Amino acid sequence: MIASPAAYPARFAAVLLSLATLCLLNGCGPSYARPRLAGDLQELCAHEYQLPVRAQLIGHDVTVICAIEGLLKATEGQVEFSPTTKANEQLGNVVEAIHRVVLSADWPVNFYAIVATDPKVPGAWVMLVRYLDDVRRVYANAIPTVEFFQRTILNLQYDPAQPLDANRVVLHDMTLEQFLVMQMSKRLQNAFRADVHFQEAYDVGSCVGQYRQGTFQFVVNMAPREGGPELTEHETSAIFDGALALIATVLHDYHFEAFNDVQLLHFPSGKTMGVPKTRLWTFLPRPS
């Protein structure tokens, strides 16, 4: 019942192209020492791309905060990520600068985040999070481009009454478990919203998850629209099966074994399903 998540739109092309050119630079540039890594990254963005940024390195994570005009579009109180050509190029430049530094650093970086605001849209910001191993794998053609984008966390936040608190969004030694929860929650949500079977009759809300004491827990938020039919037992079972297939695929592709089980909760019905790790692998799609 779950459709494959749609590919990221064409507006990411400039960012992708900047990544592709970097594979020629990887391993050839200078080594960036940890004490100066954040400062070198800021200097690179300012001098080569004329874009002031603020970079922070905490533990093994890098966060870059920047302002890019034209990144967001506001219409009647609604905000969407719709960068202009120039804004997309600037975002790609930030990505390129980060990769040039972290892939040549003398200190292992696990994750990086870009937190970008648009001066024309106060109260809104976009956060992009990536795992460095995914970056290396896409450079080596070990994963396809579409899969790389699916592994990228891209969240848009909008609260005109609450300005951006940089301390709240800076990465603090993110774990792989946390990253996988964020990624799988977003992929589940996108998959349900792309499923034509549910598009007309049901509202798909945010799918949220957590990893706690060896258990991955996810809430599937799917409610019938006003006057619409409740989900049948067969539909609920199909939703759970599809969710488990997606979760199994992601964890298998990351070779992640440090968990005991997966638990699903459907909102608003309250129906649940749990499977141990050994059974989860039976939900892996069969090779075509």
Model-derived features with residue positions:
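Polyanion-binding and phosphate-handling cores
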Residues: 32-35, 39, 87-119
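Post-signal peptide N-terminal segment of mature Sec-exported envelope proteins
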Residues: 36-58
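Surface-exposed acidic loop/strand-edge motifs in secreted or periplasmic proteins
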Residues: 71-83
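Well-ordered, non-membrane alpha-helical segments in soluble/globular domains
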Residues: 38, 80-101, 232-248
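Bacterial N-terminal signal peptides that target proteins for export
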Residues: 2-15
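C-terminal motif of bacterial Sec signal peptides marking the signal peptidase cleavage site
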Residues: 24-27
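Polar/charged, Gly/Pro-rich intrinsically disordered segments
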Residues: 58, 63-74, 103-245, 249-288
